Amino acid sequence: HVLVFINKQSYKTKEFFQFIKFTISILKKNNYIKNMSVTHTTDKEFDNDVIQSDLPVLIQFTAEWCGPCKMIGPILEELSDEFDGKIQIYEVNVDDNSQTAVKYSIRSIPTLMLIADGNVKAQHIGAASKSQLIEFISNNI
């Protein structure tokens, strides 16, 4: 066991991580920090992050130069808080991760896919408003 000391209080490793998790939850609850759950994944990590996920995953196929993708980004951050614990949200940069883009026949961006149990459940191509994305997620999880 590793002992961690904070303010002269000792914690075993497991207790320390529970303490950190509890502290973060309090900070989120009081809006001191945001969830920021939109995570970037890669060709290498896609199966582990998305296909093997216990939760449904909303994935945005995006690129740095894509204007509509940049418009959706902040909406996805908001939705990550609203759907916290119900879905995970990932982004895949198609320029850097072409294998995944080819595997899922991505021909236009932004493309949003909802994947559950390793299977594509729904797909949306193009920009969307927050209300459209809420409806898309709610109807497909």
Language model features: what each stretch is:
Residues 8-35:
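Short, Lys/Arg-enriched N-terminal segments with co-localized hydrophobic residues
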Residues 39-56:
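A short beta-strand-turn-helix
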Residues 54, 62-65, 108:
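Short pre-active-site segment immediately N-terminal to redox-active cysteine/selenocysteine motifs
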Residues 56, 73-92:
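Conserved helix-turn-beta segment immediately C-terminal to the redox Cys motif
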Residues 61-75:
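Conserved redox-active cysteine motifs that mediate thiol-disulfide chemistry
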Residues 105-113:
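Structural micro-motif
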Residues 116-141:
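Non-catalytic, surface beta->alpha helical segment in thiol-disulfide oxidoreductase systems
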